[in-house]
Amino acid sequence: MKINQEINSSKLSKFIAKSMDGKKAENIIIINLKKIKNSVTDYFVLATGNSNIHIESIANGIEYDVFKKFNEKPWNKEGVNNSEWVVIDFINVVAHIFNPDTRETYNLEKLWGDGDLINNNNEKK
């Protein structure tokens, strides 16, 4: 699946961050990975949910909002059964929704620290 020509990855990453914010996700960060050689995607969008139900709600909200606006479904979705870390893969943009402990353990911000970190207000960190 390739993202619809009308959607660019930057626009989609910001839209996903907005969707997360609408579901009261916390600590929303976009990581621009375009400059990193051999990166797996253009952008990661990271967020934290405060319970399994909250994480599931954020994930479902992203799918619904992206489909409603862009008529696109994710290529893959993982982690829904345990809701500690849900990954929604739109190929060029990958959304990660964590519980607080899992986010701290895997610390993708540090792991992919060569990318540009952008907070939800589009400000580079």
What label would you give each PLM region?
Residues E104-N107:
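Switch/connector loops and helix/strand junctions flanking conserved nucleotide-binding motifs
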Residues M1-V40, N50-V86, P100-D101, L111-K125:
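Polybasic/polar functional segments that serve as interface/processing modules
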Residues L46-T48:
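Short hydrophobic/aromatic beta-strand micro-patches
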Residues I88-F90:
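Active-site beta-strand termini and strand-to-loop segments that position acidic
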Residues D42-F44:
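Catalytic metal-binding acidic patch
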